[in-house]
From Swiss-Prot:
Keywords: Cytoplasm, Exosome, Nucleus, RNA-binding, rRNA processing. Residues 102-116 have a biased composition (Low complexity). This is Exosome complex protein C1739.07. The keyword rRNA-binding does not apply. Required for exosome-dependent processing of pre-rRNA and small nucleolar RNA (snRNA) precursors. Involved in processing of 35S pre-rRNA at the A0, A1 and A2 sites. GO terms for cellular component: cytosol; exosome (RNase complex); nuclear exosome (RNase complex); nucleolus; nucleus. It comes from Schizosaccharomyces pombe (strain 972 / ATCC 24843).
């Protein structure tokens, strides 16, 4: 076997081992809701939206690998919606103090108007996960 391919296979094998380690809690949990239990709302939202993104991007990859035009499928709309939630979660993380998870009121734009704060649609994230599990 070509040494270049051998090195690539070795790297792939290590990466797959890392994926298995990361996914082990999902495998051991009865449900995603059990996995989310005890986490903050922000952490739960991150978990739900990450799972939704993983499921939808896998479906997108399946379509592409089978020569199906994924742009005509609802998965594209779902991926865009999930990406919007990801950006909202990232924005929310910037506005939350990680130790207390209290909103950072030193930012004048946030303290002056609560309508500027991003809101994570917990119910929507839960529906997405229920739909895909």
């Amino acid at each position: 076997m070509d040494p270049e391919y051998s090195e690539l296979f070795e790297r792939l094998n290590k990466q797959l081992d890392n994926v298995e380690d990361v996914l082990k809690p999902l495998k051991d949990a009865e449900s995603i809701f059990e996995l989310a239990e005890g986490k903050s709302e922000l952490e739960q939202a991150k978990l739900y939206i990450t799972m939704s993104y993983a499921i939808n991007s896998t479906l997108y990859s399946f379509y592409k690998l089978n020569g199906i035009d994924a742009s005509e499928r609802p998965v594209m709309q779902e991926l865009q919606r999930v990406k919007n939630y990801i950006s909202k979660i990232q924005q929310a993380e910037k506005n939350v103090n990680p130790k207390t998870e209290a909103v950072n009121t030193s930012n004048a734009a946030i303290s002056s108007s609560s309508s500027n704060r991003p809101k994570v649609a917990k119910d929507a994230a839960t529906r997405i996960i229920k739909h895909h599990t």
